[in-house]
Amino acid sequence: MKRDLDRLMAERNIDAIVVEGPDGLGSANPDFNYFVQGADLTGTVIKKRGEPAMLLHSPWEQIQAESTGLVLIPTNRWNLREIMNETGDRFQAYVELRRRIFTDLGIGGRVGFYGTVHASEHFALLTGLAQKLPGLEIVAEFDKDIISQARLTKEPEEIAIMRRVGQKTCAVVQAVVDFIQSGRADGDTLVDASGAPITIGHVKQLLRRELAAQGLEDPQGTIFAQGRDAGLPHATGDEGAPLK
């Protein structure tokens, strides 16, 4: 639970945690989503030990940012264009921007970094930042990191969300069962009322419609396979194959 974060940080001697939320990686960024409660926005969450978490966000995402309940800090507090003009180099400008952010917010000491990122550019950014801030010690956790440990236990609000998603998922599964049961057997093939074969593709079309109707996401597709494919891990199924 989030209330465990300060204890976990103290146990590991972590002064602050930084959770990156870059553009385009929202659905694959559980650490960032954990703090922003699934809000559709980009930014950076920073939490100092013993203090509330802060969200650095773009000013045009103010409404989404407000829904997170975090302490809000718009990024236009720092003038990136001015920094660009001073450094004359895009990479150095972003390093300097992050240095100013950390300095102004009092971020230093042992700092852990989390979130789904573009590995190469983020490694370059952290390397440059460490050179600019001698008092910064970058802490990397390989296994059982602070956030994953905090997420092992759930707040009542999280459990309620999980139940709602479970109920919606069951409704989608029931719609698929009803659709398949509406067909009839023609030999070893399942056909619809007109006698046309019902295919895996038809089932997946229904799945996508029902998921959308329930407000659920399907970013990587749903596995629905039969026969040999069903025995192969992560085989998604041949959409043209009729149901047997």
Say what each PLM segment does:
Residues 24, 79, 145-147, 180, ...:
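Residue-level detector of flexible, active-site-proximal loop/helix-junction positions
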Residues 1-96, 167:
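N-terminal accessory/capping or targeting/presequence segment of soluble
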Residues 37-50, 106-110, 132, 153-156, ...:
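Acidic/histidine-enriched ion/cofactor-binding microenvironments in catalytic or ligand-binding pockets
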Residues 28, 64-65, 121-123, 170, ...:
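Short helix/loop capping segments that flank catalytic or ligand/cofactor-binding pockets
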Residues 19, 176, 219-220:
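Short beta-strand segments at enzyme active-site cores
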Residues 92-215:
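Flexible, acidic/His-enriched mid-domain "rim/lid" segments that flank
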Residues 224:
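Aromatic-residue-lined binding/catalytic grooves and analogous aromatic/hydrophobic interfacial grooves
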Residues 23-24, 116-119, 227-231:
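Short, internal active-site loops enriched in acidic
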